[in-house]
Amino acid sequence: MKVNKKITAMLLSAVIAAAPAAAPIMDVQTVAAATTTTKTLKNAWSKNHKYYYDKNGKKVTGVKKIGKYTYVFAKNGKLVTNKKYYKYNAKTYYKIAKNGRAKKLSAVETLAAIRLKKCGGNLKKAFNWSSSVRYAGNYKVAKKNVANYAKYGFQTGRGDCYVQAATFYQMAKVAGYDAKYVKGSVNKGKGLAPHAWVEIKSNGKTYVYDPNFQSEFGKKGYTGYKITYGQKGTLLYVKTSKGR
């Protein structure tokens, strides 16, 4: 009997050893992941609307016109949004809305943006720069308008009240303020004289910004920054234009 049991045990061991190993059960999720492929986006926006992919499926960088609108993408491909004056390169600036739609600044707006950037985007520093423009009454511009006055001031650092007001107006507009360039006259004690200044509306009130007044009377303790019409220590302003 013992011999038979030994033989039986040996035969069972041989059968088990010869049997093929059971195949491992692969996780169903692993199989699904292995067989799923990600669709490459081409000429399309990403789901979060932060990136745009070109015809080769690569992220777009730089300036790109998509449909009717222009957009600017950073070096990493991310859409640039909500910038009052975005520096694309040394000579090109864009105003970019919250949805990313971009508008290239004009030549005079670009000059204003460059100067404003040097002022750290600070309105008071921009005003001080305009009031520091050296007085020059004998100058020529192609056409006497706010754009040409401002260009002359930014390019030469010289000019009169029209130029000083024009440079500040352009910087205030680029910075996003509700600004108007105003022409008229003021009384400096010797009758009315032609003059120009800037109005900015803020919280329902209209304030006057007069860089020329600041340059003339600032050292005497007076200010032309954010004053109101009729304020003590200021000029009598008479408007002849509605501003722009």
Predicted regions and their residues:
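Active-site nucleophilic cysteine motif
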Residues: 126, 157-172
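A glycine-rich, coil/turn loop motif that links secondary-structure elements
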Residues: 153-157, 187-190
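Short, low-complexity, Pro/Ser/Thr/Gly-rich segments in the mature regions of secreted, periplasmic
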Residues: 229-244
